Design a protein with these regions (language model features):
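Glycan-recognition and catalytic cores of secretory/periplasmic carbohydrate-active enzymes
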Residues: 1-229
Length: 229
């Protein structure tokens, strides 16, 4: 909106659904992030998908923006809101996102983008960010909601690097997951960046107290083997 309260545009882009997570990372009030997320979630529930463009005045998907190409932004914001609030509502959100993917987008070779959110016609495409980001955020949302011993963290830190685990369960140290979101940043493309405790930015520290940021965790080596049947 403009300073006088008037709308700059009546159209809402699905790409902007990352905004609630950015507000939280910047240390903004959680209520503002929740309110913004609620608007996107209402649009999603109307169609069972988030169209690329939605018009607030007509309350319809814009005719050239009716597609929903499996974007990650809504799942990203749900993850950050859950981490901040521990509100089970965001787990329900994650469940509905997964159900929609399975009900509407699952095909023999993977998952297809929705070409039209009204007819649920599918497109012949599955962008790489679906695996790199969308599924990653959904995995973390539910993995971090579990008790530490039940988590399946797929990265584990030692003193010098981040290595893949052989174990399907992952490992935890002192009740903390190996992939600590208090010491790890996820880029807009879902890439992991390990943050040294002495270089945590002010914005990051506003979200997570500096004394909560630990150094890299050491995990015991895994010797799990898989039997073939």
């Amino acid at each position: 909106r403009r300073d006088d309260g008037r709308r700059i545009s009546s159209r809402v882009s699905s790409l902007a659904a990352f905004w609630p997570s950015l507000l939280l990372l910047a240390g903004s009030d959680v209520g503002e992030a929740q309110m913004t997320f609620r608007g996107y979630w209402e649009i999603f529930r109307r169609f069972g998908a988030l169209p690329e463009l939605f018009d607030l005045d007509s309350e319809t998907a814009v005719h050239f923006g009716k597609d929903a190409p499996l974007r990650p932004e809504l799942a990203e914001s749900a993850l950050h809101l859950y981490l901040r609030t521990n509100d089970g509502h965001y787990l329900v959100v994650g469940r509905e996102l997964i159900n929609a993917l399975n009900d509407d987008s699952r095909v023999a070779c993977g998952f297809a983008a929705v070409a039209d959110v009204e007819s649920k016609r599918l497109d012949d495409r599955m962008d790489s960010y679906f695996f790199a980001e969308t599924l990653k955020y959904l995995f973390l949302l539910f993995d971090l909601s579990l008790e530490p011993q039940d988590r399946q963290s797929f990265f584990c830190c030692d003193e010098t690097s981040i290595d893949r685990l052989n174990s399907t369960r992952g490992c935890a140290v002192d009740g903390r997951p190996c992939l600590s979101l208090s010491a790890t940043l996820l880029s807009t493309e879902g890439h992991f960046f390990q943050m040294p405790s002495g270089r945590v930015s002010g914005a990051f520290g506003a979200r997570m107290p500096l004394d909560a940021v630990a150094g890299p965790f050491e995990c015991e080596a895994s010797t799990t083997t898989t039997e073939k049947h």
